[in-house]
Regions:
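Short, basic, helix/turn surface patches
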Residues: 61-68, 115-120
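Phosphate- and divalent-cation-binding pockets in alpha/beta enzyme and binding domains
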Residues: 48, 71-72, 95-96
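Catalytic core of DAGKc-family lipid kinases
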Residues: 5, 31, 78-127
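ATP/NTP phosphate-donor binding region
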Residues: 1-63, 74-75, 108
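Generic detector of intrinsically disordered, low-complexity, polar/charged segments
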Residues: 10, 61-64, 72, 83, ...
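Short Gly/Thr/Asp-enriched flexible loops that form oxyanion-binding sites at enzyme active sites
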Residues: 68-80
Length: 127
């Protein structure tokens, strides 16, 4: 079974993930992922949990705004081998997601992740 770490910021944007969280988790579960879910509590929380648990999963998915995504990537940069990264935009502007064409509707973004849609990836060197 594939393992996923799902990190989300419940305060991002207008807290819109709260109404869609169960649908998102259902999409991942039905796709065969063993989920570990982490709700961010404070600044740098996403970075710390990804740095600590990222090596134990096949994919890290974060949901929040550009700040949550930045923290998630910062945590991944501390890993020797990076898992795949998925992003479900839930912030107020979502500039990064818009620039890559990631769907703004959260369930659609979740489906893209499980279907293996790929966008330009981070280089392994971090540069």
């Amino acid at each position: 079974m594939k393992k996923m770490l799902f990190v989300f910021n419940p305060r991002s944007g207008k807290e819109q993930i709260k109404g869609q969280l169960m649908e998102i988790l259902d999409i991942f579960t039905k796709a065969g992922y063993e989920l570990r879910v982490h709700v961010t509590q404070k600044q740098r929380d996403a970075m710390e949990v990804v740095a600590r648990l990222g090596k134990k999963v096949d994919v890290v998915v974060c949901s929040g705004g550009d700040g949550t995504l930045n923290e998630t990537i910062s945590g991944m940069m501390k890993l020797k081998k990076m898992p795949l990264l998925g992003y479900i935009p839930a912030g107020s502007t979502n500039d990064f997601a818009t620039s890559l064409g990631i769907p703004k509707r959260m369930p659609l973004a979740a489906w893209d992740i499980v279907e293996g849609c790929q966008f330009p990836s981070l280089p392994q060197s971090g540069r």
